[in-house]
């Protein structure tokens, strides 16, 4: 297998492993609040929104140290260990208790920080300026396929149900736990690129032994250097501007992954299909994500206009979706009680419009995330772990804040917050992309996704 083929193989395995893990986790997140509402009529008392706020809050704080962890342990083992914690969190829903539910939320927050920093590092070392766009698109399309498979099962399994029984819950979460473990094991199929694991012609085995002996001493240096680089990158102009865009992706991630499905499941006017529509919504979010990732990956070699048109498409698609959601859903849908809401929207609530908005949310999200992955890999190819850690730090802290306020804010206020951040995030991304293009024009090669 040629070096380039091996790198492409690694990207595909990375995407497939994440597809399995997040088939389980994103399906879990999509139905968590609905499942917990059913559980709250028993001895269990908890909130899916609060759990997600804990996860993303711990996630954001943990990103400060994850570059050091990945530098010492390596991306492959980091992702495997993180996958075990993801599986543990999902397994908690088989027989949940408040203490285990919230404790697992803390652990998965730490694991998520390690996982995504390692993913960014793995993506970057298996790419160059020519392939980063293509590889970002391939990874994103495979990752977001997870939304399709898990939610397809939810749609058929929960069709016609207004309450989630104990048997239904256990069946779903046992299956999701197994799926997550399969993805975790797949990380062991990722190979080191030839440039990292093949000795040069002039390098003897004695030289290699010397490197092994020195590696323990170098680990501490690597950890400290990675920690310092994270703080230095935080205050660069480009990273500060991209942080506004990243903040928006955190807010809209919370909305489409947790809040929107809950809104659909709370609208009593949708009738007996309201719970199964949560699964259908997730499927169409996934279709939008897959379409976007695949399309931008295929166009990466031919797009001469840079990343900005894709981001512009993303914000326009999202603004259309937000407006339709504002018209189609009652304002109290995100915070409705277990019995749901009978409130009226500005128009007659339509299942078809709700599902269309799911597709638009997924498509717009893929526009932003593929371009952020691409530009980070391009600008910070030498400091990928710290750069992706900062990206996930900002994204996750905003997601945590959004999950927290989702317990209290009516729908139209949540939409307004996203519109404001989306507008300024788009402008800030444009600024960084223009500067990147100017830098390339002065002598470096350039490929946009």
Swiss-Prot record:
It is found in: Membrane. Its main location: membrane. The modification Phosphoserine is found at residue 204. InterPro entries: Ion_channel_UNC-93 (IPR010291), MFS_trans_sf (IPR036259), UNC-93-like_regulator (IPR051617). Pfam families: UNC-93. The chain crosses the membrane at residues 8-28, 53-73, 74-94, 96-116, 138-158, 170-190, 239-259, 277-297, 309-329, 359-379, 385-405, 410-430. The keyword Glycoprotein applies. One of its GO terms (cellular component) is membrane. CDD domains: MFS_MFSD11. It comes from the Eukaryota. Keywords: Glycoprotein, Membrane, Phosphoprotein, Transmembrane, Transmembrane helix. Glycans are attached at residue 40. It is a multi-pass membrane protein. Belongs to the unc-93 family. This is UNC93-like protein MFSD11. The lineage of its organism: Eukaryota, Metazoa, Chordata, Craniata, Vertebrata. The gene is MFSD11.
């Amino acid at each position: 297998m040629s070096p380039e083929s091996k790198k492409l193989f690694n990207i595909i395995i990375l995407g497939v492993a994440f597809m399995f893990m997040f088939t389980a986790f994103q399906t879990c997140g999509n139905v968590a609040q609905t499942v917990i509402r059913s559980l709250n009529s028993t001895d269990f008392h908890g909130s899916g929104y609060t759990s997600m706020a804990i996860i993303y809050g711990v996630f954001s704080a943990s990103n400060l140290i994850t570059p050091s962890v990945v530098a010492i342990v390596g991306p492959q083992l980091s992702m495997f260990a993180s996958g075990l914690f993801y599986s543990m969190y999902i397994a908690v829903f088989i027989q949940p208790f408040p203490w285990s539910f919230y404790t697992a939320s803390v652990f998965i927050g730490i694991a998520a920080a390690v996982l995504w920093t390692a993913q960014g590092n793995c993506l970057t070392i298996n790419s160059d300026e020519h392939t980063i766009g293509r590889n970002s698109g391939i990874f994103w399309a495979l990752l977001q396929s997870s939304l399709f498979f898990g939610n397809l099962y939810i749609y058929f399994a929960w069709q016609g149900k207004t309450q989630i029984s104990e048997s239904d819950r256990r069946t779903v979460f046992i299956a999701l736990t197994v799926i997550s473990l399969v993805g975790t094991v797949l990380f062991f199929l990722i190979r080191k690129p030839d440039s990292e694991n093949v000795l040069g012609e002039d390098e003897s085995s004695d030289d290699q032994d010397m490197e092994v002996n020195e590696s323990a001493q170098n680990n501490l240096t690597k950890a400290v250097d990675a920690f310092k680089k994270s703080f230095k990158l935080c205050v660069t102009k480009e990273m500060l501007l991209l942080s506004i865009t990243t903040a928006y992706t955190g807010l809209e991630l919370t909305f489409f992954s947790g809040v929107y499905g809950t809104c659909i499941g709370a609208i009593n006017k949708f009738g007996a299909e309201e719970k199964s529509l949560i699964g259908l919504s997730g499927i169409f979010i996934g279709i939008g994500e897959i379409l976007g990732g695949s399309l931008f990956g295929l166009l990466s070699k031919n797009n001469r206009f840079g990343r900005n048109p894709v981001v512009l498409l993303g914000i326009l698609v999202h603004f259309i979706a937000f407006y339709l959601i504002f018209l189609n859903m009652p304002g109290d849908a995100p915070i409705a009680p277990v019995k749901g809401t009978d409130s009226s929207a500005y128009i007659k609530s339509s299942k078809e419009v709700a599902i269309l908005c799911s597709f638009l949310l997924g498509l717009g999200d893929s526009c932003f995330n593929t371009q952020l992955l691409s530009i980070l890999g391009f600008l910070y190819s030498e400091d990928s772990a710290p750069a992706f850690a900062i990206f996930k730090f900002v994204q996750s802290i905003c997601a945590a804040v959004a999950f927290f306020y989702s317990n209290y804010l009516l729908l139209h206020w949540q939409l307004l917050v996203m519109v404001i951040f989306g507008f300024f995030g788009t402008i800030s991304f444009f600024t960084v992309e223009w500067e990147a293009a100017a830098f390339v024009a002065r002598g470096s090669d350039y490929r946009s996704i």
